[in-house]
């Protein structure tokens, strides 16, 4: 990076910008002085976001409620970058132009769109029978997201003031784009049971999810959870201990979660058509080629994180002082990682597989 001495001024006496001088062969002020003096470079960033949610609830019958909601999000991001040839003067009466780097005569435009939709419907039912309290919840979930990018640039602008690709007539032009889409479909439930006003507690829940990120036959996974609790302090035998200890609760739980965070199409072997060879043929343009991606794993599926936990809760001084102790064991199966090492002669990287296991434990 080259900067200027304090004796250099950004503008010559004749009003032209300073970029190079007879005393320096390096760009003065890194060329920014000339660019700012001309004032024709322009950048614009625009972001738009629209989101809405509709929700409805129904009381179907006593203790039975059904709810449904729909969410929609559209995100749009646009950029425009215009750079032009920048005039400057090295000697009096002689105008030169900066035509490389930041002085390339070019217009770039990009546009990114995200569309997201989610639909949920679920119901819950409560039932009290003597000392038994039961609550059941079950539902359905669907969500999808689509992403699309467009990028265009072209040189040879006919105007230094107008921003329109129709006014770019140069041969140097690039265009690129891309789009991705995924969908997630799932059903879920939760059952809560309480006996004797919360003396004995039980809960079970689970999800059955399917993801478009995996090949058909490997898209769905079931992830259950369950927990039990015993409030020892509510037992009759606890008796006089209540004077000093307000709450004693023993907990035991097991839970599993699914992880689908892989690429949108990792299970598909793709073809890249944007390659350019370093060879010039008769039309004086570099030849294009298509290349096949690295091999993929056909049985890539969900990563599953399972956790066992045991805990103890204590409450003192009318529950103003609370102590909690926990110990857990976590087992992560099917972690996505590079698969079996392939011979160097194969000429490609190893495909991702559910080939890694992580085991952790702790107590606090």
What is the meaning of each model-derived region?
Residues 8-10, 219:
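Alpha-helix N-cap/helix-initiation sites
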Residues 10-36, 87-100:
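A subset of solvent-exposed loop/turn segments in beta-rich extracellular surface proteins, enriched
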Residues 1-8:
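Low-complexity intrinsically disordered tracts that form flexible linkers/tails across taxa
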Residues 364:
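Conserved Walker B
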Residues 1, 24-83, 99-361:
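Extracellular/periplasmic, surface-exposed regions of secreted and cell-surface proteins
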């Amino acid at each position: 990076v080259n900067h200027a001495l304090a004796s250099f001024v950004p503008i010559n006496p004749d009003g032209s910008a300073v970029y190079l001088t007879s005393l320096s062969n390096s760009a003065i002020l890194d060329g920014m002085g000339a660019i700012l003096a001309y004032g024709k470079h322009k950048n614009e960033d625009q972001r738009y976001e629209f989101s809405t949610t509709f929700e409805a609830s129904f009381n179907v019958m006593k203790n039975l409620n059904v709810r449904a909601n729909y969410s929609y999000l559209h995100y749009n991001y646009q950029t425009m970058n215009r750079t032009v040839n920048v005039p400057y003067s090295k000697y009096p009466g002689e105008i030169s132009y900066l035509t490389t780097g930041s002085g390339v005569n070019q217009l770039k435009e990009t546009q990114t769109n995200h569309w997201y939709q989610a639909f949920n419907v679920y119901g819950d039912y409560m039932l009290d029978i003597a000392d038994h309290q039961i609550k059941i919840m079950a539902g359905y979930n669907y969500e999808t997201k689509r992403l699309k990018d467009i990028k265009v640039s072209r040189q040879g602008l006919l105007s230094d003031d107008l921003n329109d690709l129709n006014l770019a007539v140069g041969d140097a032009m690039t265009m690129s784009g891309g789009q991705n889409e995924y969908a997630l479909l799932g059903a879920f439930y939760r059952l809560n049971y309480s006996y004797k006003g919360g003396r004995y507690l039980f809960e079970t829940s689970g999800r059955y999810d399917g993801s478009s990120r995996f090949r058909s036959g490997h898209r769905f996974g079931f992830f259950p959870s369950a927990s039990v609790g015993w409030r020892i302090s509510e037992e009759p035998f606890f008796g006089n201990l209540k004077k000093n200890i307000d709450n004693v609760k023993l907990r035991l739980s097991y839970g599993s979660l699914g992880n689908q965070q892989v690429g949108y199409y990792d299970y598909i072997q793709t073809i890249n058509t944007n390659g350019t060879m370093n060879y010039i043929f008769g039309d004086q343009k570099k030849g294009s080629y298509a290349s096949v991606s690295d091999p993929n794993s056909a049985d890539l599926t969900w990563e599953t994180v399972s956790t066992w936990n045991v805990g103890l809760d204590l409450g003192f001084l009318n529950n103003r002082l609370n102590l909690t102790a926990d110990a857990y064991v976590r087992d992560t199966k099917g972690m996505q990682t590079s698969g079996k090492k392939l011979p160097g002669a194969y000429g490609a990287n190893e495909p991702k597989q559910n080939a890694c296991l992580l085991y952790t434990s702790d107590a606090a």
